[in-house]
Every structure is written in structure tokens, then in C-alpha cells.
């Protein structure tokens, strides 16, 4: 049986070790599961003979907390965890979240804001010369100068502010092994400048071969046009086969150099990574706190792929995992599934089989495997490329094998299917079997919007494509003798979304006959195409000016429009309708979103506090004919 890696000096000594080779400092609790980057990288290093100790969620107010194992022989590895620490801590409205799913019992406050910078500087206070290598999503997406939504300014590469030596960006397996081997052979960390998938600092470019010179930090900080140009160059250099080395100048601090991305893992390498001896659970020290909430959903889920060629503008996957699909073999996935069914708390349900996009099981075309993805076009947007290979046969076969396993009652597909890719496949077997076997009443899909203008900036297919998918899904349900529904995810206030487009989305929600309980407001996270548009007002790939709903108030209005039935949103909805010139939607008709203010009740305070006033003995009972309520329409 696998045992957890050391988290204390006693754990280290119990193994007979005097010193660890690497100390992995993470902002997450320690969960030894393949869905956690800390587990993957530390287990991979262990498999190559390196001794790794884990310091999960150290107290950043005490420098002693970073010295649990003393000085490591080779270096410190630092990650904020599975999520960016700022996204983990704050909503898009910049309000503190109440729960941290990656901490014991969901407790908030066990990691600092900007965890990578804080941890790295904490290490430097005690271990001034020990190599520090950054990794994980927070460091990866801040590897060059970037717009920071929380401070509303352009910030340095995280390498500058952290005082670290290297960034291992992306998924990191190839680069971390190469870094470890270099350090182990005695190469100084300052000379490890050749590893693909890394970022390093240097004083000049004398040892950098034909770099692409990006606009300097001072330029991108001062000029939004320069920022957009820089982003476009970086966006077009995310493929390991075609990317160049990029250099960004920081004045007296020298240069930050980004090497091309590491090659994607082969299927054999993917299998090896997921076959490492993970315990599959959180460390027992968290038992008293109720465990780690993030594990609950993924404990009985299976990762089948990495990478995504969907290229949604608001998604960071292009910068982090890349566009080239990497998959595990059926044998590897089935082996994990069988092991899963033997867990004492397995109830017969596999919660998900997928990855960034569940139904991607092969590269979009064969060219990707040898020449990389196209720099000047996308695989699915604005419509599927003529060279796209849309084929679900392998995924269908995998799902069938999983369904046939003993002890398995049902296999769900919850990580999302790309509906335009489903439609591009002329064989309807997958859609038919998805409806029949892998959905439980509702299929969650992500059209994101209904306005083709907004969808263009999102990098999503037109609304007509989504409507066609709904018809095909309905046919598949009828064929299976089931009544199931597609539940759409929508996003408000994305760049390009004017108030008129927001009202159009509200009308669509009205016609669906349901009110979304949760609305995803666009969140400008580092290194996405949409965030570049948000900050600059420019589409970096076309130079086109883009309307951006930026103020907190306008974002609140667009969000409220999607939940127009909620009485507390009435004033915001009314304001949005006025701005859009759509006062025809205020009235008593079935197409209206809100009712007019009642005569005799003064100003809008009555409606803002409608619920309270109805209960007041001083208020007359409301007439049924003018309730701020819409009858839920029956699903067709």
C-alpha cells in the first residue's frame, strides 16, 4: 500500500533520510491524488529516485514554517496550488469568498494572497542561495508581464517579484525532470537556461539564440497598444513545435526569457504519470477537520485527456496545457477505474470521464503531432476547420468498457462536451449513448451567450449551432425514451457585450422559462485573450476595438438582467433596460421582464423591498395580477 510523502521532519527521519532533495511548498492541503499538481510532480520525482518532502499551507507569517525539513539538497518547488490564490480568495466583484475547497474543512485563510510570491520570498529570508523553482497555474499564467485585475495594473513577471530562479510553466513533467537532473549533476541553477517549458532571468541576450523581442515592461505598462501586441506574440508562440524563445526587458533588472513550451506527453508517458503510486486521498492529518472538500467530486472521477483545441477566449488552457490533445490509454483508465471500485466508499457511480473537454480523445488533425497547431487559425472557431477529424469512436469505446465493469452502476460525463464538435461528427452514436447512459436528467453545456457578436469575441460557435445541438439532443433523448434537458451556462459582461446584448440574453432566459441560480460574470484572470481585451479594449489578434463593460455597476446590471425575476434586482434591471432602449420590456405583457412601479407607492423603494413590504401590516396585500413573477414554462 502507498504511503504519503513526508510532511514533517519525523516523517523524513522515519524513512531513514537525513535530508530531502526537494521541498515542495504548496498553497493547497496535501492530497495525494492525480488531480492535484503537487501529487503528480512529487510522485514523478520520487519515481526517478529523488526524495521529496511536502510543506502544505505553511504559516507565511513565520519563516520557521518553511524550514520544516531544513535546507533541501537540490531546491525548493513552490506552487499556489490547483487554483490561482487570488481567484481562490475573491469573487469577480472582489469580495472575499467564504470557502476554500482546497483547505481542511473548506476553511478560508490558510494561504496568503499571491501565494507564490509570498512563499518564495519567505524561503529567500532563510535560504538565500538555495534554488527556488516556481510551478503551477499561478506562476504559469504570470510568467511574463501581465494585467492584474485585483490591482488594476500591469505587473512584472512573477519571476521578478518572487526572487525565484526558474518557472516550470505548463503541466511541468518534462521540465521538472530535466531541471532535477541538471541540479543533481552539479549545474548551477543560473546556468539552467536551455530547458523547454521554463522561464529564467538574465542580464543580457548574449547567450540567447535568436529571441523574439517583446515590447519591454515599461512599454506594456504605459501603452495598451504595446500590451496587445505583446500578448498577440505570446499567444502565437504557445505551441512546442513552432514557438520561439521570447525576451522581455526590465531595465536594470535585465531580461526575462521564456523558452518554447515542453513537448506534450506521449500516451505512454501519460499512462506512466497516472500509474504512479498515489494514495488517492487527503493526508490523515485533515481527518479531524472533515477532510478536503475539493476531493469529494474528483475522487471517483477519471482523467482521460489533457489539452484543448477549443480555444475559448476566456480560458487559460492555451497558455497552460496547450492545444495539442494528450490522452491516456484505455488500459490505464480501466486499471484506475477497477481500483476505484474497490474503495470502501465507492457507491457504483463514476462521476466523470474527461478533462478540459470530455469528448476530445485525439488531436484535431494529424498535422498537430509533427508540425504543431496552426498559428493563424483555430480548429473549431468560427466554424470547424476542413482538416478537423471529428470522431468519437474511441471515447464511445472507452465509456462502454467502463459501463461494463463490475460494481459500476453508472458512468457520468460531467466535465462538459463541446457541442460543435459533437455536431461535426457525422456518426451520432456518441450523442445517442450520451443521452441514454451518461446523463442523469440534465446535461450541462456551455453556449455562454446568445449574441453572435459576443460569441465572436468569446471564440465560441454561433448561437444557431447551439440551437441545432439542442434539437439533436432532443432526438437522442426521444430515441432513448427519456425526457432530459440541456442546462446552459451563460456568462455576463464579457468584452463585446453591450447592454443591448445583455438584454438579448435576458430575453432568451425568459423564453427558456427558468432563472439561473448562479450567473458567471466574466472574470479577468491572467493570460487569457479575453483579459487582454478587457484591459486594452483591443482584440489583440485583429487590432479591432472592443466594447468592454468595465465598471462594477455595469457588470452588476448585466448580471442582474439574467436574474431579472429576483425582486432585489429590479432597479438594476430597470436601469439596464433604459440604457438599452428597451422599455418595451417593462409592463404586464408575457414578454415583459419586470412590472412598472405601482401607482400610489411613491418611488422605487417599494419595489426594492417588495418582500418586506408584503409582510408589513401597513402595506396592502398585493394584487395577484401584478406580481413580479413569471410562471415557469413547461419544457418542450
Region annotations inferred by a language model:
Residues 371, 377, 593-636:
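Acidic, low-complexity intrinsically disordered tails
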Residues 61, 190-238, 262-265, 292, ...:
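Terminal amphipathic helices with adjacent charged low-complexity linkers/tails
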Residues 37, 56-251, 258-259:
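Glycine-rich beta-alpha loop elements in corrinoid/cobalamin-binding modules
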Residues 24, 55, 59-60, 339-487, ...:
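Conserved SAM/AdoMet-binding glycine-rich loop
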Residues 25-28, 289-316, 341, 349:
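N-terminal pre-triad scaffold of radical SAM enzymes
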Residues 165, 273, 308, 333, ...:
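Conserved, mostly hydrophobic/aromatic
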Residues 84-93, 141-143, 173-178, 203-206, ...:
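Flexible glycine/acidic-rich beta-alpha junction loops that bind and position SAM and/or redox cofactors
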Residues 158-170, 560-604:
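Amphipathic alpha-helical packing elements
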Amino acid at each position: 500500500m502507498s504511503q504519503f510523502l513526508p510532511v514533517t521532519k519525523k516523517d523524513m527521519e522515519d524513512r531513514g533520510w537525513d535530508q530531502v532533495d526537494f521541498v515542495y511548498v504548496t498553497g493547497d492541503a496535501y492530497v495525494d491524488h492525480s488531480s492535484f499538481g503537487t501529487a503528480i510532480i512529487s510522485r514523478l520525482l520520487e519515481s526517478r529516485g529523488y526524495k521529496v518532502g511536502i510543506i502544505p499551507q505553511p504559516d507565511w507569517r513565520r519563516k520557521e514554517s518553511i524550514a520544516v525539513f531544513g535546507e533541501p539538497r537540490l531546491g525548493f518547488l513552490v506552487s499556489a496550488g490547483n487554483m490561482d490564490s487570488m481567484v481562490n480568495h475573491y469573487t469577480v466583484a472582489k469580495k472575499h469568498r467564504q470557502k476554500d475547497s482546497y483547505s481542511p474543512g473548506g476553511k478560508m485563510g490558510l494561504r496568503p494572497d499571491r501565494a507564490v510570491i509570498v512563499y518564495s520570498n519567505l524561503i529567500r529570508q532563510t535560504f538565500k542561495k538555495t534554488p527556488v523553482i516556481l510551478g503551477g497555474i499561478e506562476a504559469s499564467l504570470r510568467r511574463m508581464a501581465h494585467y492584474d485585475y485585483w490591482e488594476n495594473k500591469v505587473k512584472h513577471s512573477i519571476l521578478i517579484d518572487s526572487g525565484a530562479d526558474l518557472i516550470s510553466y505548463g503541466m511541468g513533467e518534462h521540465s521538472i525532470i530535466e531541471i532535477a537532473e541538471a541540479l543533481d549533476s552539479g549545474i548551477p541553477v543560473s546556468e539552467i537556461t536551455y530547458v523547454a517549458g521554463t522561464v529564467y532571468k538574465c542580464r543580457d541576450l548574449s547567450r540567447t539564440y535568436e529571441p523574439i523581442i517583446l515590447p519591454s515592461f515599461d512599454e506594456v505598462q504605459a501603452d495598451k497598444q504595446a500590451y496587445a501586441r505583446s500578448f498577440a506574440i505570446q499567444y502565437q508562440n504557445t505551441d512546442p513545435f513552432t514557438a520561439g524563445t521570447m525576451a522581455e526587458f526590465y531595465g536594470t533588472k535585465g531580461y526575462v526569457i521564456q523558452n518554447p513550451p515542453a513537448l506534450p506527453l506521449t500516451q505512454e508517458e501519460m499512462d506512466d504519470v497516472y500509474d504512479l503510486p498515489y494514495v488517492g486521498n487527503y493526508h490523515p492529518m485533515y481527518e479531524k477537520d472533515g477532510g478536503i472538500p475539493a476531493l469529494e467530486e474528483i475522487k471517483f472521477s477519471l482523467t482521460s485527456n489533457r489539452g484543448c483545441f477549443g480555444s475559448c477566449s476566456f480560458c487559460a488552457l492555451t497558455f497552460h496545457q496547450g492545444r495539442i490533445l494528450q490522452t491516456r490509454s484505455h488500459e490505464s483508465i480501466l486499471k484506475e477505474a477497477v481500483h476505484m471500485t474497490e474503495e470502501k466508499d465507492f457507491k457504483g457511480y463514476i462521476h466523470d470521464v474527461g478533462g478540459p473537454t470530455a469528448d476530445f480523445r485525439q488531436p484535431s488533425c494529424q498535422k498537430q503531432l509533427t508540425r504543431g497547431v496552426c498559428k493563424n487559425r483555430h480548429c473549431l472557431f468560427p466554424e470547424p476547420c476542413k482538416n478537423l477529424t471529428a470522431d468519437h469512436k474511441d471515447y464511445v469505446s472507452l465509456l462502454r468498457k467502463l459501463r461494463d465493469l463490475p460494481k459500476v452502476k453508472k458512468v457520468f460525463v460531467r466535465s462538459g462536451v463541446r457541442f460543435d464538435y459533437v455536431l461535426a461528427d457525422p456518426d451520432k452514436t456518441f450523442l445517442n449513448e450520451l443521452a441514454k447512459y451518461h446523463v442523469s436528467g440534465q446535461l450541462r453545456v456551455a453556449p455562454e451567450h446568445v449574441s453572435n457578436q459576443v460569441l465572436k469575441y468569446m471564440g465560441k460557435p454561433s448561437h444557431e449551432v447551439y440551437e441545432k445541438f439542442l434539437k439533436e439532443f432532443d432526438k437522442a433523448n426521444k430515441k432513448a425514451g427519456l425526457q432530459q434537458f440541456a442546462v446552459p451556462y451563460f456568462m455576463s459582461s464579457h468584452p463585446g457585450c453591450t447592454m443591448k446584448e445583455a438584454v438579448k440574453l435576458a430575453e432568451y432566459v425568459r423564453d427558456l422559462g427558468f432563472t439561473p441560480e448562479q450567473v458567471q460574470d466574466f472574470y479577468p484572470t491572467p493570460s487569457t485573450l479575453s483579459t487582454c481585451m478587457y484591459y486594452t479594449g483591443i482584440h489583440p489578434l485583429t487590432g479591432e476595438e472592443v466594447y468592454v463593460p468595465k465598471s462594477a455597476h455595469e457588470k452588476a446590471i448585466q448580471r442582474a438582467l439574467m436574474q431579472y425575476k429576483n425582486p432585489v434586482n429590479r432597479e438594476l434591471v430597470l436601469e439596464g433596460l433604459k440604457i438599452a432602449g428597451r422599455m418595451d420590456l417593462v409592463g404586464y405583457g408575457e414578454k415583459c421582464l419586470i412590472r412598472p412601479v405601482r401607482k400610489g407607492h411613491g418611488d422605487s423603494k417599494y419595489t426594492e423591498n417588495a418582500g418586506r413590504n408584503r409582510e408589513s401590516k401597513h402595506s396592502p396585500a398585493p394584487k395577484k395580477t401584478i406580481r413580479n413573477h413569471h410562471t415557469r414554462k413547461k419544457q418542450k
